[in-house]
Amino acid sequence: MGVLEAIWWLAVGHVVSDFVLQPEFMANAKHPDSECQREKYGPWWLWMGGHGIMNGAVTALILGVWWVGPIEAAHHALTDWAKCKGHVGFWEDQVSHALMKGLLLWIVIN
């Protein structure tokens, strides 16, 4: 797979894993300060971790290298946690995800 094709698939994978496969209840359930969601769906870290792992798995599958999965999962979950806590906004969150995917691609191809 060429670089442009990898960028394309990373973007598609991000849209699918960060939006399509994250329904509204998951976006709410992964929020650390959402007491009502905790009673309904369980601990926030379970949903945040699951969402991060899903993003990491998609990235690892696209790049074909297993070790990018845990790195992407941790980064994705930490960035989303920062967004939930109000430390970064939506666009900073999305740019951070894109930059990490770009960095991982650069490391893999070099």
What function would you assign to each model-found segment?
Residues 1-5, 59-69, 108-110:
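Transmembrane helix interruption/hinge and helix-loop junction motifs
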Residues 9-55, 73, 77-108:
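Interhelical loop and helix-boundary elements at the membrane-water interface
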